[in-house]
Each structure stands twice: as structure tokens, then as C-alpha cells.
Amino acid sequence: MQPSSNNCYDTGLREECGVFGIYDLDGADVSPSIYYGLSALQHRGQESCGIAVSDTSGPKGHVKSYKGLGLVNEVFKESKLEELSGNIGIGHVRYSTTGSTTVENAQPLVLNYLKGSLALAHNGNLVNAMELREQMENTGAIFHTSIDSEIIAYGIARERVHSKTVEEAILRTVKEIRGAYALVIMSPRKLIGVRDPYGLKPLCIGKRDNAWVLASESCALTSIGAEFVRDVAPGEIVTFDKTGNLKSEFMPVDVKKAHCIFEYIYFARLDSKIDNISVYEARIRGGATLAKTYPVDADLVCGVPDSGLASAKGYSEESGIPFGLAFHKNSYVGRTFIKPTQKERESSVKIKLSVLESVVKGKRIVLVDDSIVRGTTISNLITMLRKAGATEVHVRISSPPFLYPCYFGTDVPSNKQLIASSHSTEEIRQQIGADSLGYMPIEELQNMVGDLPICRACFDSHYPMEVPKQDISALLES
């Protein structure tokens, strides 16, 4: 999700999102389920959210929707949910680029066109968004947002006029787009899920009684009492309609799969399974690898809440050094990684975490975290640990150094903002104030997820597809 430099587009950091959809064939109201599903995906985006619903027994094409800035529980009060009654619906959580936190850019997007209505929610990023947008504008398209999700929605609506079904229109549209996308789409009588052929972004299927569910992560299924059925396969389009059956077809492409490894390192919730791999177990394996690769004499292994905790436990189990909690987390402060400005990130670190002095005083600490992007968080935490009496702080990072930008929707920005692109490991160690620093060796990264093919381009620049030559900040958002 990148901004353009033109007028309404803004320069800044990229975003990650969560999508959710449900179709209850018994006619039950789904808006409460969407609310709880989005709440379970809140870690994937905290700046805006939205819900769009329809009633398959009502007037064809009538969609009710509401979007707002803030957390799910802030935007959707009970009275608002009561206005969004329907037995089919989709939802979205988002965090945005600097300056683009607007309701207009919140999702789901709802289009009314010749064939009826279409609502769409998107997680990911298109690498040819500017090219497609220019082509569409040259043929009369008028866009109302600065997000590339609108390009997808507009493309489907255009192709639908010449297609027998929405699915056919989707197939025609995805032939033209390049990038990462997990989509949930609601047409008047169908719920549709789409996953890009590389499998870069996650999407799974669940079932609760006579309702079908789509979600970015399995934790959202659990939150509404749905059973996990399976992941949507890379390149697959799944459809749920009044027959109650799951219909599947695949894009006619054959590409090497490249699942985003950062889902397992940081983004996904600990209790989720993605592509049949437990996020928790993947992080445990990562921590164990760090212990084997970078052993150190220490008294306590601690993780940075939340995404560093499981890796710290893995380090502890492998090394035999006791595991402990060094920090208390204020759960009412959002992730530092997804704050839109550097100043907000720095202040957020100190408000979000406080040191348990009685635990760390006089101890040699191994501090495990998921990544170092700018160095903001880890430097502050080391200072806090030392002020609380820690005698040594040894940092272990469960990902390799970030050296290259991500073009597919993960908040890994341009090279100038990546500390590892201009500093050696020793220079970073000195800058953050650690006694030692060890990153996950890139050759060991695969061990976290077994034989699952992964994208690790932000570490080695081996992108799974051709990416733009211009700076990433010149791309559209999603």
C-alpha cells in the first residue's frame, strides 16, 4: 500500500491489513461475527476499519456499509452494528501511510455499477498500480481514493459487463494485475475469496454451522466459533453461494510460490496457523536456531512483547537459560511498527512497555526481538533495561537484517530508512547499545517453516516477480 507523489497521494510508510468475510445460509445476521472477526485481526491494522453487508433475500444489490478511523471497538458501537443487518458481509482493518489516514481510503470499497453492486476488501499491494490506474483514467475512469484496491474493484466491475459471472470477471482482472493480494469480495448473492498465485498474503476458509467464513488468519475463525477448513491455495478463487457448496477454480498461471516469511516472524497472531504451519511453533524454532548460532553466558532470556516472546522461549529451551518476563505491556497502546510517524513510534515505545526491575536487576539478559528495521524500539528498550539494573544486554533477532524494500504490502520502507542498509552489524550493536548482537542467518530462515516456499526479498533482494525500478514511495497505496 504505497502513496503516489501526486496531489492527494502522500509519501510515507507502507501498510498491512486484515480481511474477513462470512455468508450465513440460514439467514442469520452476520455483523456481530464480522465485528469479532475484525477484532481478532486488529493486530494487522489499527487506523481504520469497515464493514459492508447485504441480505441475500432482500433487494438485489442493496449494500449497507460503514467505515471509520480507529479501532474496531471504537468505530462500531452496538447501535451502529444494528444498522448493518444482513446475512452476508465482509470487513477490513487497515493501517496507512503518513498523511493518508482518511475515511475515503478505508475499506471495504463498495461499487454500484451496471450489473449491481460489488464490495471488496484487500490485503496486499500491486506493483503495477500506477500503470493500470493511468490506463483506466485514460479511458474515462474516475477514482475516489488513492488506494490500489480501487483499481482491482474497478477492473472487476468493468470486466463483469463482458462476463457471464463475477468469477469470470475476476479471472479476467487478475490477468492484468501484478503483486500481492488476498481479497474478500461480496456480490449480491456470493462471497468470494481470491489469493494471489504466489501465496504472498494469507487467506483461509472456515465453517460455522451453516455459515462459510473467509479470514486473513485462523485466529479470526476461532474468535467466532468457526472451524478451520483449509487455506485458500495460491492462485485459487473460492466462491460460496446459496447452494452452500464451496466452489473452486484456479488462475491459469504457473509461478513459483513465495509465501511471506514476515507473517511467521512478526505479523500473524501467535495462535494462528498459516498454510498449515503454526506461527507459535515457527517462532519457537527460530529462537532455538538463534541459541545454536549465537550462544552466550547469561542469566535470563526475555522477549520483547508480543512477537518476540515465543522466539525467546525457543532460545531458552535450546540454551538452558531460564525464560523470564522483563516487561509489562500496556495493552491499550498500539504497535510501534505501524505508527505512521517516527516521533509517534518513539513515544509509543516508552508508554507501551515498562521494565520489571525486580526481574532484571543484576542480571545478564538475552533480549530476543523479531526484527530491527529503524532501531527505534530496541535502542529504547536496552536503555530501559540498563536503567533498571541489567548488567548486560545481548540482543538476538529472529530475522536477518532488513536490506531491501518490500513491494508487496509489508512495512519495510525504502533503503534509507533501513538501518542495516547503511550500517554493519557491529555498528548497529554500538548504536543500539547492546553488549552483543546476533541476527538470524539467512540460510537458516527456511528452518522456521520447513519446506514451505518463502519470499525473503527484503533480506536478499530476490523478488518473486519483476518489481518497479522507481522508488517504492512512488507507488499507490492499497
Task: Please provide the spans of the model-predicted regions.
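Conserved short alpha-helical segments that host acidic/polar catalytic motifs at enzyme active sites
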Residues: M1-P234, T239-A298, V304, E392
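Secondary-structure transition/capping motifs at alpha-helix termini
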Residues: A141, H162-S163, P295-D299, E317-G324, ...
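PRPP-dependent phosphoribosyltransferase catalytic core
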Residues: V174, R189, G225-D231, T383-S478
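Short, glycine/charge-rich flexible loops or terminal/linker lids adjacent to PRPP-binding catalytic cores
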Residues: G320-I365, T376-S379, L403-G409, P413
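Mobile, glycine- and charge-enriched loop segments
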Residues: S354-V368, I372-V373, I397, I472-S478
